UniProtKB/Swiss-Prot annotation:
Record topology, Cytoplasmic segments: 1-20, 67-75, 120-145, 192-220
Family statement drawn from the similarity comment of this UniProt entry: Belongs to the CDP-alcohol phosphatidyltransferase class-I family.
Source organism of the structure: Saccharomyces cerevisiae (strain ATCC 204508 / S288c)
InterPro entries for this protein: CDP-OH_P_trans, CDP-OH_PTrfase_TM_dom, CDP_ALCOHOL_P_TRANSF_CS, CDP_diag_ino_3_P_euk
The name this protein goes by in its record: CDP-diacylglycerol--inositol 3-phosphatidyltransferase
GO cellular component annotations of the record: endoplasmic reticulum; endoplasmic reticulum membrane; Golgi apparatus; Golgi membrane; membrane; mitochondrial outer membrane; mitochondrion
Amino acid sequence: MSSNSTPEKVTAEHVLWYIPNKIGYVRVITAALSFFVMKNHPTAFTWLYSTSCLLDALDGTMARKYNQVSSLGAVLDMVTDRSSTAGLMCFLCVQYPQWCVFFQLMLGLDITSHYMHMYASLSAGKTSHKSVGEGESRLLHLYYTRRDVLFTICAFNELFYAGLYLQLFSNSATFGKWTTIISFPGYVFKQTANVVQLKRAALILADNDAKNANEKNKTY
């Protein structure tokens, strides 16, 4: 009887409460709370912000383990990443006015490259923006297909900004300085990957537009 039973119909409410999506909601809450304590409580901020970042690895694992991969989860994951980093960078713009333009450019690159990369991947019929063949881009293939590489580079990217943040407080200035120095190579790799995926996304979209234009021309 159990082998022939009809699987329960999945509803929107089920998807909303998938285990990885619940983890995603916790990520949003901890990231938001970290903004409230960011100005005066570096220890509390570090714990909350780190929790939000570390849960990023857990939600993907749970999605695969329980077969609960969803578009909602993928989008929630990406916008939480971008929003939490943006919040920290906004604070750094205020505290490091001499580097404000640099932070603005890096934030723009981060948001633009990830949005265009996801949109272009979906437009090309791919189920995930992380599906990058080695022939398309060796760097992005390494970055997106190796979970250890993806986790390490993303961690270094966050640690670079976190190190700059910690340098603002006397009790953690030295630790913050070394955190920034050690994470810098990974940070450079991340920005390079952003540039590469931005270029790749633009080419994919342009190629799709060219194909559509040629198809329309055939009708005339």
